Each structure stands twice: as C-alpha cells, then as structure tokens.
C-alpha cells in the first residue's frame, strides 16, 4: 500500500528587513524568516527567533521579498518551520518519511523507496 503525504521541500517566508544581527532566542515581532547563515534560517515564532536548519544543497537564500530554506536534507530531530507543520519530506537516503510535528521533524514511516513528486510524498513499503 502506498502512503502519501504533502511534501515540504522548501520553506518560504517573508523577508524581515530588520533581521541583521538577530540570534536564536532574541525577541522579535510578527512572523517571518531571515537567513542567519548559509545553512540556517531564523523564524520569528511566538515573539522569539527560532533556528530552522536548511541542510539541502540550496541552503538559505534571501531574495527581494522572500527567504527560501532548502530542507531537503534535514534530519529527524531538526526544527521545522510553523508553515511546514503536518507536512512531510523524504529522509535523504530515501528510506523513510519525516513529518513536521510540533516544530520538530519526526520519522513517521519506513520505506523501501520514498519519492517526492509535485509536492506529494510517496512511501513504498
């Protein structure tokens, strides 16, 4: 039987212009993302900056109006963005599904093969 989940291959958020010099744990207002490093984004959630790893090959990139965080190589136990809650991605070896639950990626299924097509995660037992 095939199990399907929505894929969260990348996180897209608003670019916050006041993001310079911010660190995880610092206070913030509203919501959105900034790139702290090439492989790390910060998300303003609940009035506090929280780290979100961007382990995929595209890392964390800021454009004129958005921040893109490539989460395609993130691991179980990594933080995930609030916009990814309930969504999944394939583990980097293609043998499991990771799903964002309460702000943390959890391994939810083992697979012989996991693929993402058109935003849909398919896990073959």
Residue ranges and their predicted role:
Residues 17-19:
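C-terminal motif of bacterial Sec signal peptides marking the signal peptidase cleavage site
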Residues 21-125:
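Cysteine-rich, disulfide-bonded extracellular modules and peptides in secreted proteins
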């Amino acid at each position: 039987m095939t199990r399907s989940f929505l894929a969260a291959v990348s996180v897209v958020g608003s670019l916050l212009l006041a993001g310079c010099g911010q660190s995880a744990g610092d206070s913030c207002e509203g919501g959105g993302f900034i790139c702290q490093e090439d492989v790390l984004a910060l998300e303003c959630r609940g009035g506090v900056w929280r780290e979100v790893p961007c382990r995929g090959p595209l890392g964390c990139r800021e454009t004129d109006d958005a921040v893109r965080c490539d989460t395609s190589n993130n691991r179980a136990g990594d933080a995930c963005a609030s916009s990814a809650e309930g969504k999944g991605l394939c583990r980097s070896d293609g043998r499991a599904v990771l799903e964002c639950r309460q702000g943390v990626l959890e391994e939810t299924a083992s697979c012989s093969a996991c693929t993402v097509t058109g935003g849909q995660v398919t896990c073959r037992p």
